[in-house]
């Protein structure tokens, strides 16, 4: 990890995110929803790739032309971006889109882990209701405040999403009532996922494991 990234992301936070992600990628590989790789720093960005490393060994051009996907955490001065990179089988070019901005690396990590955990819950070998739908039905925790995005917030998104009118209408800032400095900036369709702001990693793990078969839970030992 380069020095600039180390200044922005404390090592203990890196270790915590990697530890919980390792738990969930192990579950993904167990249920056949993987393979998911270990987190990997590349040019100051943390990649959480799926269907990548083994095929890269078999075909060196897989990085450029393969159909792998990845969540990417990018530390920027003052905030943390989470993007999704994907190349569909029939598309010529890979797409990458910024999805959420957080004030905290840990919250960015929880977002990525929630996405992986929900993909496991809804995969064909598990078939549970997604946490997203559960949270959507219940509504956000009262400890999370929802506000219209500021001009500065909108500026972050239109730099990469290039749709100011849409952002002005749909972009929101979600912050903890008791800790306004802990926030996420996202389009309103992401609102249920902003519940992660109010959860610890252990609480998120318990929510994702809820209802899973014993064949999975018996192999899980969160530390």
Region spans (language model):
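N-terminal "first-domain core" detector
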Residues: 1-75
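Intrinsically disordered, low-complexity, charge-dense segments enriched in Lys/Arg
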Residues: 47-48, 52-54, 58, 133-223
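Intrinsic-disorder-associated interaction segments
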Residues: 3-16, 20, 101, 105, ...
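Short aromatic-glycine-(Arg/Gly/Cys) micro-motifs in beta-strand/loop hairpins
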Residues: 63-97, 172-176, 189, 203-222
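Hydrophobic alpha-helical segments that drive targeting, anchoring, or assembly
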Residues: 42-72, 84-105, 109-118
């Amino acid at each position: 990890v380069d020095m600039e990234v180390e200044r922005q992301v404390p090592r203990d936070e890196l270790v915590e995110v990697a530890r919980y992600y390792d738990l969930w990628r192990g579950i993904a590989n167990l249920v056949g929803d993987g393979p998911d790789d270990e987190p990997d720093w590349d040019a100051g960005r943390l990649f959480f790739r799926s269907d990548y490393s083994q095929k890269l060994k078999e075909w060196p051009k897989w990085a450029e032309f393969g159909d792998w996907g990845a969540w990417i955490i990018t530390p920027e001065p003052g905030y943390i971006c989470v993007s999704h990179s994907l190349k569909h089988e029939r598309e010529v070019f890979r797409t990458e889109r910024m999805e959420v901005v957080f004030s905290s690396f840990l919250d960015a990590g929880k977002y990525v882990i929630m996405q992986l955990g929900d993909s496991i819950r809804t995969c064909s070998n598990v078939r549970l209701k997604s946490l997203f739908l559960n949270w959507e039905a219940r509504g956000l925790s009262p400890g999370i405040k929802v506000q219209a995005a500021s001009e500065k917030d909108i500026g972050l998104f239109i730099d990469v999403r290039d749709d100011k009118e849409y952002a002005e209408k749909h972009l929101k800032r979600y912050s903890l009532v008791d800790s306004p400095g802990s926030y996420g900036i996202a389009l309103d369709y992401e609102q249920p996922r902003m519940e992660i702001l109010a959860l610890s990693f252990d609480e998120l793990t318990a929510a994702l494991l809820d209802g899973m078969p014993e064949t999975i839970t018996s192999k899980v030992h969160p530390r």
